Structure formats: structure tokens, C-alpha cells
A protein has these predicted regions:
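GHKL (Bergerat-fold) ATPase N-terminal catalytic module, capturing the glycine-rich phosphate-binding loop
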Residues: 1-185, 192, 199, 215-222, ...
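GHKL/Bergerat-fold ATPase module in large chromosome/replication-associated machines
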Residues: 117, 135-158, 178-181, 188-693
Length: 693
């Protein structure tokens, strides 16, 4: 061909400066773009071989080579794919690739940082000019009679094409790096970037340093490959030792046989895994395979709890593995990492437009070749196809969890404490996920047993039925009067009691256990929001903290009138505590050891907790105490101390005992303030001194 000098486009003067400016923090994507192009060329050549339009050499081995040369400030990308003719260079490099880069810029220029093209995908060959002052291409097409082509451009508006000297089929791209980007000619930096973007590309990628000294390794002679370069043959004599036999005589024994070995030029090792675990059938993978892959990809040496292997071909192609990581404490970060791939090419982490938000707390990889990539984030949000992908992933996660609950209940319970925050967060964020998981959410009770919501409600309903049956005779006489009223009355909600602190609420737990009553443990930050949502979605039950009221089951059957005691002690406590808003009741409780119980209204306490959470999160503006929960102090008429206080209400120490009973009740509910605790300790000492007199 004759030498050709041409112009890329009359509008190209500002193209490369714009690309450099916008992608300043992501210059390294040129590695991904150029290696991806090489992979595509190799894949196409293999397809031509499969359909009989080209015959690959018998010793053909697909590979991409990356050669760094810090001395010459160059970087080479070499593939043995299908190569290009002069006409194809003209078409694909000067027109199609350039047009693609121009389209990329057009899409970028009106986008905010939050709405950029995901992974900056689509820039292609011209991404090289982000780091290079000059780029050359040397290529030879697979087509019979094709001649080598050389192409060069300095990143401006002009290019030169001429006959080349390349001998093997494929393409070699050379980047002459600019002074600001010499880091990319560093072998360690190159390795880092290739492993970031290309760890699982389907073609083997080899990295080497130009003019590096030869490295060698020693192998057994029988392990020699045809591709090995032998430097030296080595014969190792058999190793022997003198040992004493069973007769006590010494003899020479062969410890290891003679070996023939070879010193060879060190075999190159690819940087990537061309068949990552997610591309395989789940039946081909062992537990150790999944764990090893997790350690390799996420550098997390705590074993994952379990995983989900996604494998779908219709109506879209999607493969991947999602891991449930182990979280040691509530305060551990539960931020996960979901890596998105396209045909084994890394695109980006945590693309919330594709991956449901609540799944971001997991760790995993998802490969979806059908995903539209050269679009903005906002376009993805409104893409019906992408929504189907998101819904499919959510469904598979729910199916896995439900399957475990049904068939591996013991394992499900074992993992529950770790996965419950994730599942509850998912229920808060995704209605469909919540609908599927509703009956498979576990609640750990005060007896350390795990139950689902339906299982929890059965005893509650049975208890309610017993109470109803015991009153059946009395109710029958009133049946005709109450039928109409019952129809109008809203159905009564079953109450599920819960504990937020087993130590703090220990007195209440003891009372519940003595009466064979149960309560569940809800001690995570997310639980308040979660149970509120459950109540909103279901009118048949409600949650109450164990200290929200004194349930009838804790009261004795004594029907004595306690009006006088209530009035007397209420006046005493309100006056002593200087708290007119405090409600004081006197009840006959079954446990005579309990003197006083402080209960807080469920609604008021939840509002107070929410205000505290907002304040802790920096969302100030409201005083958390403005929604102070209504307090009720219940005094036990069967307790000796309460009886004494009633009988000696005007006594010298009545106020001291009243304050002490209140603080003791408060301690079973929540920590005392510093000032209140100081007074409590001082008062306790005074009471003990009284006992010594």
C-alpha cells in the first residue's frame, strides 16, 4: 500500500484534552479497554476457526501480552487475534473507534459526576490517548494474502498509515507515555491495574518487563512441555543414609532415588483466571472452591457464612456468586462489595442501579453480558430490562433463604444472628422481598430458641383461646347483647413481647419465665424500624417491650380493693419525687419478691428512641426528651416493703424508701443519670446504716 497521511476529524482538536480532563481519576481504564479489544479479536478468530473460515495453527495458544518498558517510557499490548487489513484499520480505527470515542464524549459532557456512564465503558481504543503522547498500531490480518499495516497518531487530528513489518497474525499497540503517566510503565503498577480490571478475562494475560534478566526454574525431566526452553540438564544422584536394621546391623538405605531434572527458562504465569468460579455449574464447585474464591477476590480471611450461585440463561444471561459475610459485632461495618462484570470484564463496584440497594451489604460478583453499559446511571434506573435483573437477583436471594429455613433449619438458626440485620434491612427496603420472607424471619426468644412469626403467634393465640374458653359460660349469658358490638369492634391484636437488653430488663425476664411467658430478643439498631413496619403491614399483632405494661398474667388472682393503697402511695411518690406526671398503681403481683416495676408506654418510648437516633446521626433540631415516654410505677401489694411503706406513709424514712423503690424500678428499665446514681449510692449506704442500729 502507499503511505497515507490523513485527518481523523475536523472536530477532533479538543477531543483528547476533554477525555483526559473528565477521566482524570480513572486514567487506568485504558488497560481494560485495550486488553478487552485484544480479547474480542481472539474470540472472533476462534469463531472463524469453528465455522471453518480459518484454520488455527496446531500450536496456537490464545494470549495477550503486556510489556512494560520504563527505560523507553513505552507500553505494548500484543494479541494474536484476527488482526486487521489496511482497509479495516481505515474503517475501525479512523472511523468507527473514533466515532465511538466522540459519542462517548457527547454522552459525558452533560452528565454530573453522579450520572456518569457506568465504569466509563465505551471509550475503546482512543482511551490510550489519556496517557500517551503517541500511539502506534502494527497489525497483520488472518486473511490470506494480507500484508502488515503500521498506523501512528500523536493524539491530535492527524494519522499516518504505511506498510508494516509485523510477521505474526494479530495486533500490537504501542503507547509512548507522556511524562505525567510514566507510572503505567512500572511493572508493579501494571500488575495492580490488570488485576483490578482483567482478573477474570477469558483470554490469558501475561505481563513482562522489556530487557529484564532471564529467570529460571528447575523441573523434573518427565514434566517437560514442548514449549519449555531447556538451559541445562541436571542429574541428581540417589540419596542414601546409614541405618540400623532389625538385627542391629548397620546398612546403607536409599532415601530418595536418582532424578533427572531440567533447568528451564521460567514459564510465564498468566495474571488472570480465565474460568472463574461463577462461569462453572454449581455442581462442579466444592465448598472449598467457593471459600478460596471469596478469599482471593475480597481479601477477607473470615469464612463467609454461605453463598448463592446465580446461573440464568433466559430471558437474560446472568451468572454470579453472592456471599453472606460474617459480621462479628453490631458495630462491624456491614458495607459489602458487589462487583459487576460484563463477559468477565470488570465494570465497577456497587452499581446500585443494577444491584438492589439492600444487597450491597453482601459480597459477590455478578456477570451480565446483556447489561447495557454505554449508558448513564439515570438511564439504567428507568430501564425495564435492568429492573428485571434486579428483581431476579432479589428473588434468588429470598429463595435461598427460604429453602434454608425449610430444609436446613439448624444451619439457618446458626447463621441467623449474622444475617438478620441484612434480611430486616431488605424487608424495609424491598416490599416484594418482605412479602416472600415474612414467614421465614426468625426471632430468638428469652429461652434462646428460634421461632418464625407464625410459630410465635401460635402460643399467643392458644393462650387467648384458653382465656376465652374460661369465660365462655359468662359470655353466653351476654351473647345476645354483644353480638352487634362485636361486629363493629376492631379485631384485637395479639401481643408479642420483646426484650432489648437482657441484663437491663433481667427482672422482667425473670417474672415472665416464672409465669411461662415468652418474649423475643430485639437488640439491634434496626429492630425498632423493622417491627414498626411489620405492625403497619399486619393488623393481627403488635409488639410491646417487656416493660411496656404489667400484663394480667403477672398479676395474682387476689381481687382485693387496692384503691386506698393506690391513692395513698401515689400521693407519697409524686410528692417525694416532685413528679405530678408520674402514674402510680398498686397491683397484687404473683412474685412477692418484686417490690416495684416501672413501665413506659410503647408508643412514647419508640418516639423517644427515634429522636435519640436522629440526634446521634447529626439530625438535630429536636430535643429527644420532648417525647418522653409516659411512666407508670407499679407497686406490688404482696411485697413486704410496699406493705410497710403503706402502713408507715408518715414515717421518718418513708420518703427515702419511696425514692429507693423508684430508683430500683428505674434501674431495671434504663441506666440512671450520673446525678441520680450518685444519690442512689448515697441513699443505699444510709439505708444499710439504719440496719445496723
Amino acid at each position: 500500500m502507499t503511505n497515507k497521511h490523513g485527518t481523523l476529524s475536523i472536530d477532533s482538536d479538543n477531543l483528547f484534552p476533554i477525555i483526559k480532563k473528565w477521566l482524570y481519576s480513572d486514567h487506568d481504564i485504558f488497560y481494560r479497554e485495550l486488553i478487552s479489544n485484544g480479547c474480542d479479536a481472539i474470540t472472533k478468530l476462534k469463531k472463524l476457526d469453528m465455522i471453518g473460515e480459518y484454520t488455527l495453527p496446531a500450536d496456537y495458544k490464545a494470549k495477550i501480552q503486556v510489556i512494560v518498558n520504563p527505560e523507553e517510557k513505552t507500553l505494548k499490548f500484543i494479541d494474536n487475534g484476527l488482526g486487521m487489513t489496511a482497509e479495516e484499520v481505515e474503517e475501525y480505527i479512523n472511523q468507527v473507534a473514533f466515532s465511538g470515542a466522540t459519542d462517548f464524549v457527547e454522552k459525558y459532557k452533560d452528565k454530573s459526576d453522579a450520572d456518569q456512564i457506568i465504569g466509563h465503558f465505551g471509550l475503546g481504543f482512543y482511551s490510550a490517548f489519556m496517557v500517551a503522547d503517541e500511539v502506534t498500531i502494527d497489525t497483520l490480518s488472518y486473511k490470506e494474502g494480507a500484508t502488515a499495516v503500521h498506523w501512528a497518531s500523536d493524539g491530535g487530528t492527524e494519522f499516518d498509515m504505511s506498510d508494516g513489518t509485523k510477521e505474526g497474525v494479530g495486533t500490537e499497540i504501542t503507547l509512548f507515555l507522556n511524562e505525567d503517566c510514566l507510572e503505567f510503565a512500572n511493572e508493579y503498577r501494571a500488575r495492580e491495574v490488570i488485576e483490578k480490571y482483567c482478573s477474570f478475562m477469558p483470554t490469558e494475560i501475561y505481563l513482562s518487563k522489556a530487557n529484564a534478566p532471564e529467570e529460571y526454574e528447575t523441573i523434573d525431566k518427565e514434566d517437560k512441555l514442548d514449549t519449555d526452553t531447556v538451559v541445562e540438564e541436571i542429574h541428581e544422584e540417589a540419596k542414601t543414609e546409614e541405618k540400623e536394621n532389625e538385627n542391629g546391623e548397620k546398612e546403607v538405605v536409599e532415601v530418595s532415588p536418582a532424578k533427572d531434572k531440567l533447568k528451564i527458562v521460567k514459564r510465564p504465569v498468566p495474571l488472570n483466571d480465565t474460568q472463574p468460579l461463577w462461569t462453572k455449574s454449581p455442581s462442579e464447585c466444592t465448598d472449598e472452591d467457593y471459600k478460596a474464591f471469596y478469599r482471593k477476590v475480597f481479601m477477607d480471611y473470615k469464612e463467609p457464612l454461605f453463598w448463592i450461585h446465580l446461573n440464568m440463561d433466559y430471558p437474560f444471561n446472568l451468572k454470579g456468586i453472592l456471599y453472606f459475610p460474617k459480621i462479628n459485632t453490631e458495630y462491624d461495618s456491614i458495607e459489602g462489595t458487589i462487583k459487576l462484570y460484563n463477559n468477565q470484564v470488570f465494570i465497577a463496584d456497587n452499581i446500585k442501579e443494577v444491584i438492589p440497594e439492600f444487597l450491597m451489604h453482601l459480597k459477590g460478583v455478578i456477570d451480565c453480558p446483556d447489561l447495557p453499559l454505554n449508558v448513564s446511571r439515570s438511564a439504567l434506573q428507568n430501564d425495564g430490562f435492568v429492573k428485571k435483573i434486579s428483581e431476579y437477583i432479589t428473588k434468588k436471594v429470598a429463595d435461598k433463604l427460604i429453602g434454608m429455613c425449610k430444609t436446613e433449619k439448624e444451619a439457618y438458626e446458626k447463621y441467623w444472628d449474622d444475617i438478620s440485620p441484612f434480611i430486616k434491612y431488605g424487608c424495609l427496603k424491598d416490599t416484594k422481598f418482605c412479602d416472600k420472607m415474612n414467614d421465614y424471619i426468625l426471632f430468638k426468644d428469652i429461652n434462646d430458641k428460634y421461632q418464625t412469626l407464625p410459630e410465635l403467634l401460635v402460643p399467643v393465640e392458644d393462650e387467648k383461646k384458653e382465656t376465652d374458653d374460661s369465660k365462655a359460660d359468662d359470655a353466653a349469658t351476654e351473647e345476645s347483647k354483644t353480638d352487634d358490638a362485636a361486629e363493629e369492634k376492631e379485631p384485637e391484636r395479639s401481643t408479642i413481647y420483646y426484650v432489648t437488653d437482657k441484663v437491663q430488663q433481667g427482672q422482667y425476664i425473670k417474672m415472665f419465665k416464672e409465669q411461662n411467658m415468652n418474649a423475643v430478643i430485639l437488640d439491634h439498631n434496626i429492630d425498632t424500624s423493622f417491627i414498626t413496619q411489620l405492625e403497619q403491614r399486619n393488623e393481627h399483632y403488635q409488639f410491646k417491650r417487656i416493660d411496656a405494661d404489667v400484663t394480667d398474667a403477672l398479676k395474682s388472682d387476689d381481687t382485693a380493693d387496692l384503691t386506698e393503697e393506690t391513692t395513698t402511695l401515689s400521693d407519697l411518690f409524686k410528692k417525694t419525687l416532685n413528679n405530678d406526671k408520674l402514674t402510680v398503681k398498686v397491683e397484687s403481683l404473683k412474685d412477692a419478691d418484686v417490690a416495684s416495676i416501672l413501665t413506659l408506654s410503647e408508643q412514647g418510648r419508640r418516639m423517644q428512641d427515634m429522636m435519640k437516633m436522629y440526634a446521634a446521626g447529626g439530625m438535630g433540631g429536636m430535643d429527644p426528651n420532648m417525647f418522653a415516654a409516659d411512666q407508670t410505677l407499679t407497686l406490688n401489694a404482696n411485697n413486704a416493703l410496699v406493705k410497710y411503706l403503706f402502713e408507715n406513709k408518715d414515717g421518718e424514712h418513708a420518703s427515702m424508701f419511696a425514692e429507693q423503690l423508684y430508683d430500683l424500678a428505674m434501674l431495671s428499665n434504663q441506666p440512671l443519670s450520673a446525678d441520680a446514681m450518685s444519690k442512689f449510692v448515697k441513699r443505699s449506704n444510709e439505708i444499710m446504716l439504719l440496719l445496723t442500729k
